Amino acid sequence: MNQVLTQSRPIRLKGRSFLALVLSPELPLDGWLDKLDDLAARSVGFFLNRPIVLDLENVSIERPQLVQLLEDLVKRGVWITGFENARPSLLGPGMPPAMRGGQPAADFDPEITEPKSQERTPVAPASVQLVKAVPSMVVTEPVRSGQSVYFPDGDVTIVGSVASGAEVVAGGSIHVYGALRGRAMAGTAGNADARIFCRKMEAELVAIDGLYKTAEDMESRLRGQAVQLWLDGDYMMAETLN
C-alpha cells in the first residue's frame, strides 16, 4: 500500500518598501493639533487610509503625554503606524513599533510668499554639468477621483488630468499635461530640487519635500493657469508658464 505524504509549504517572507507620511509634533501639543486640524479642513481626506509615522526627535514628551496624543490623533482619523527617533521608555506593549531607515524630510511649513520678480539680468554662461539619469514613470491615462499614483524613485508624468480627490506622489518632479485638480506631492524622498509643472492649476494641495500649500494658500492669479512650482530655501515659489 502506497502512502502519500503531503508536506506543507513553508511560509514565504518577502521584503517591500512602502511610502508613509511623517508628522513631527511640536510643543505645545494643543497648538500643533490646531494646525493639523486646519490642514485637514483645507484638504479633506488628506490623512484618510494613509500610513503615518510620528517623528519624536524634536519634542520632549513623556509616555502619558504620548498616549494622549495618539488618542487625539485617532479622534481625527490619523492612525500612527510607527515611531521614529523615539526613546526606549516610550515604546512597549500597546504602542506602535519603532521605525528605522527612513529618509529625512523637511518639516511642514504653511508660510506664504509672493513670487520673486521675473526681471532678467545679464548672467555669465552656465557651465555644463553631467547628472545621473533618474527613473521615471509615465501615466498615459487621466488619474480619476480616489485613485493614487505613487512613484518614490523618480519623476512622474501624467499625460492627462488629475481629478479632484486624486493624488500623485513622486520622489522627483511631477509633470501634469492637463488640469491638476487633486493633490500633487513631489520630492518626497528629501529632494528639495523637485518641481511641479501643470497645464492648468486647480490643485487641492501641492507639496515639495514636505513643504505644502493648499488651494486657499495659493494666489488667485495662478488658478487656471499653466504653472511651475519650486522651492527657494524654506519658501515655495510659483510662476506662470504662459
Swiss-Prot record:
- Entry's InterPro entries? CAP/MinC_C, MinC, MinC_C_sf, Septum_form_inhib_MinC_C
Q: Which SUPFAM superfamilies match?
A: Cell-division inhibitor MinC, C-terminal domain
Extract one GO BP annotation from the record: cell morphogenesis
Key words of the record:
Cell cycle, Cell division, Septation
Where does the source fall among the domains of life?
Bacteria
Pfam families, alphabetized: MinC_C (PF03775)
Q: Does the UniProt entry include the keyword Cell cycle?
A: yes
Assembly information from the UniProt record: Interacts with MinD and FtsZ.
Q: What functional role does this protein have?
A: Cell division inhibitor that blocks the formation of polar Z ring septums. Rapidly oscillates between the poles of the cell to destabilize FtsZ filaments that have formed before they mature into polar Z rings. Prevents FtsZ polymerization.
Q: Which family does it belong to?
A: Belongs to the MinC family.
The record's listing under HAMAP family reads:
MinC
Tell me what this protein is called: Probable septum site-determining protein MinC
Q: Which source organism does the UniProt entry give?
A: Brucella anthropi (strain ATCC 49188 / DSM 6882 / CCUG 24695 / JCM 21032 / LMG 3331 / NBRC 15819 / NCTC 12168 / Alc 37)
